[in-house]
């Protein structure tokens, strides 16, 4: 695995599996609380129900921002996370990570990082109105990138324009 500083992690997967820059380690500030999905969607920090209002507003505004979704289906032998970086130009940079943990606690298993993907951000549906849009943004036409973004490139893309 390649860390954000460009150093090669010696725990990288063997067998020629390509290493990817870990966007989760880039320190991007999330625009909304991380969302956890099990039987329903909840705010990961509080465990309480989440209406997705923050994510819906981010979608409607069309600006830059970051969302993280944690997929935790039962009985607990697989975990998946998705980091979506909205670039403010109708595009989003996405990375998924997963880990299977059949014989050990999931926290002890390293993440398998997916390739960076560039997606189009779909137009919000007419049912989404300001202060009344409780949906996760929809991404379309996602395609893996030939080369990963660095954490520096992410920081530049996520910076507010002067």
Residue ranges of model-derived segments:
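Signals and flexible motifs at protein termini associated with secretion
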Residues: 1-162
